[in-house]
């Protein structure tokens, strides 16, 4: 009887030990999972001008970015600043963003097409203002594939001349597949961001974007996730 009791005690001890070990492992695994999921990146995109509102001057836009930097530093919030080409070529933004610590801030490309980029690429500007928010002018979709590549080359060359490296990320309300693939292959970007859905805003509509988290984009349409 004593042998049976001893045997049962050993089994019970092993069961309790394994249960505790498994519980500890599960907690560690859950903790690791939660840590992996806590990914937040603040993105501010910068345009030089805003022709839709007279009171939003170039100075107002610049001071807005200065304030954003102050707040992010105050609360120790890292993030990314995407520069539209007209802002990229402005010495105020160059000086401000070059001074940011690289371990907390990233500088990337904002892919809307303003007048200076088009003209520096050797093309005629068709917009109503130096930056036009309509899709046939303000986005790469308004240009031929060859023109899109030239626009990308001009932007990247000037970005590297100013910052000493090519941007690793790019953002836009909409990036076409040809442009994104070209910039990925030629300049080795590792990430991009886009708008998911909007109806009748800014002179165009988009629908059917992939919500929730990061994804590998489809080679047919960037707002859709790759099926494989």
Question: PLM ranges: what are they?
Answer:
Residues 22-30:
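Bacterial Sec signal peptide processing site at the extreme N-terminus
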Residues 1-8:
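Bacterial N-terminal signal peptides that target proteins for export
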Residues 47-50, 62-72, 157, 161-162, ...:
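Catalytic grooves of carbohydrate-active enzymes
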Residues 29-103:
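Active-site beta->alpha N-cap acidic-glycine motif
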Residues 85-173, 228:
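Metal-dependent polysaccharide deacetylase catalytic core of the NodB/CE4 family, i.e.
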Residues 40-44, 79-81, 107-110, 168-170, ...:
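Hydrophobic faces of well-ordered beta-strands that scaffold small-molecule active sites
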Residues 168-228:
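Active-site-adjacent pocket scaffolds in enzyme catalytic domains
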Residues 18-19:
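C-terminal motif of bacterial Sec signal peptides marking the signal peptidase cleavage site
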């Amino acid at each position: 009887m004593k042998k049976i009791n001893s045997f049962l005690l050993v089994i019970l001890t092993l069961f309790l030990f394994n249960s505790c070990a498994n519980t500890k492992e599960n907690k560690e695994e859950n903790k690791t999972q939660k840590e992996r999921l806590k990914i937040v990146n603040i993105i501010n995109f910068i345009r030089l001008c805003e022709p839709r509102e007279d009171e939003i001057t170039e100075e107002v836009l610049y001071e807005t970015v200065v304030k954003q930097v102050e707040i992010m530093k105050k609360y120790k919030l890292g993030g990314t600043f995407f520069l539209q080409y007209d802002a990229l070529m402005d010495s105020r933004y160059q000086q401000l963003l070059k001074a940011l610590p690289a371990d907390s801030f990233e500088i990337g490309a904002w892919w809307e097409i303003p007048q200076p980029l088009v003209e520096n690429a050797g093309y005629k500007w068709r917009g109503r203002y130096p930056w036009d928010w309509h899709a046939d002018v303000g986005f790469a979709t308004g240009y031929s594939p060859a023109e899109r590549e030239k626009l990308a080359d001009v932007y990247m060359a000037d970005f590297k001349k100013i910052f000493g490296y090519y941007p690793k990320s790019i953002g836009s309300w909409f990036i076409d597949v040809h442009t994104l693939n070209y910039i990925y292959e030629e300049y080795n970007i590792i990430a991009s961001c886009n708008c998911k859905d909007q109806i009748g805003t800014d002179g165009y509509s988009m629908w059917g974007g992939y919500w929730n988290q990061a994804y590998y984009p489809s080679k047919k349409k960037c707002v859709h996730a790759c099926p494989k």
